[in-house]
From Swiss-Prot:
One of its GO terms (cellular component) is extracellular matrix. It comes from the Eukaryota. A motif (Nucleotide carrier signature motif) lies at residues 239-244. This is Mitochondrial substrate carrier family protein ancA. It comes from Dictyostelium discoideum (Social amoeba). PROSITE patterns: SOLCAR. The transmembrane helices are not perpendicular to the plane of the membrane, but cross the membrane at an angle. Odd-numbered transmembrane helices exhibit a sharp kink, due to the presence of a conserved proline residue. It catalyses: ADP(in) + ATP(out) = ADP(out) + ATP(in). The gene is ancA. Belongs to the mitochondrial carrier (TC 2.A.29) family.
Length: 309
């Protein structure tokens, strides 16, 4: 193996470890908000939540879940989420830098437009590629978080039980329910998430962005994650709804398009944004991922990464 290939492998492993660690820490911190967001988003498609028992908002959801299922239940599905999130973020960050070498041919100073487009393409392509590998884990995490049962009334006892139960009933296709719309949504989100962050740092902080303060990086990351979350949220709502009908005898939506149409006509356009406020708050975790990743790179003396040119 040539020295160049060895360096590439070493860089890939390094990016995977740092990105995954940063992601796992931030996800655990915002896990309660993550679960509330998912419950608000999918409750209309849940067989466990009757229409007259649906949560009225963030506060109502927090209070009722804590009271009915216990405070610890706010972290339900978190272990699965961390397991899922480690490879997801690791692959996103690692693939992003590989795609970046291909798509980003200009610096922000040389050509801001091409620099921005290159970052959008590299970020989006990284998200779409990694999604293919980890989608069943993301699917299981959603179903576990949406399970509001207690004791024997729970739908699934854990990650393994969830995956095996859906697989036995629907086969592999059941674990990829909503995958099509997910690709579009993840591309939009990751494009804005990575592309916006790298571009903003390059333009606002200049070529010495690696020396940027923690708070400057966090401020940029916070704005970027909020915007990315809002833009891609309708895609996320549709894919979560599609996930909820896997393993069920009664099919709510015949296709992804049917899901878009029924949500819009039966619940109204605002239904696509249920839980969006929780998502914006949760975005702090996404901002932390970007900043923690950069800080770890600084501490370890690595070049490249999220904040690289």
């Amino acid at each position: 193996m040539s020295n160049q290939k060895k360096n590439d492998v070493s860089s890939f492993v390094k990016d995977s470890l740092i990105g995954g660690t940063a992601g796992g820490v931030s996800k655990t911190i915002v896990a309660p908000i993550e679960r509330v967001k998912l419950l608000l988003q999918v409750q209309s498609a849940s067989t466990q939540i009757a229409a007259d028992k649906q949560y009225k908002g963030i506060v109502d959801c927090f209070v009722r879940v804590s009271k009915e299922q216990g405070v610890i239940s706010l972290w339900r599905g978190n272990l699965a989420n961390v397991i899922r999130y480690f490879p997801t973020q690791a692959l996103n960050f690692a693939f992003k830098d590989k795609y970046k070498k291909f798509f980003v041919r200009h610096t922000a100073k040389e050509n801001p437009t091409k620099f921005f487009i290159g970052n959008l393409l590299s970020g989006g392509a990284a998200g779409a590629t990694s999604l293919l590998f980890v989608y069943p884990l993301d699917f299981a995490r959603t179903r576990l978080a949406a399970d509001v049962g207690t004791g024997s009334a729970r739908q699934f006892t854990g990650l393994g039980n969830c995956i095996s139960s859906i697989y036995k009933r629907d086969g592999l296709i059941g674990l990829y329910r909503g995958f099509g719309v997910s690709v579009g949504g993840i591309f939009v989100y990751r494009a804005a998430f990575f592309g916006g962050y790298d571009t903003a740092k390059g333009i606002l902080l200049g070529e010495n962005n690696k020396k940027a303060s923690f708070w400057a990086s966090w401020g940029i990351a916070q704005v970027v994650t909020t915007i990315a979350g809002v833009v891609s949220y309708p895609f996320d709502t549709v894919r979560r709804r599609m996930m909820m009908q896997a393993g069920r005898a009664d099919i709510l939506y015949s296709s992804t398009w049917d899901c878009w149409v029924k949500i819009a006509t039966r619940e109204g356009p605002t239904a696509f944004f249920k839980g969006a406020l929780s998502n914006a708050i949760r975005g702090s975790g996404g901002a932390l991922v970007l900043v923690i990743y950069d800080e770890i790179q600084k501490l370890m003396g690595f070049e490249g990464g999220v904040g690289s040119e």
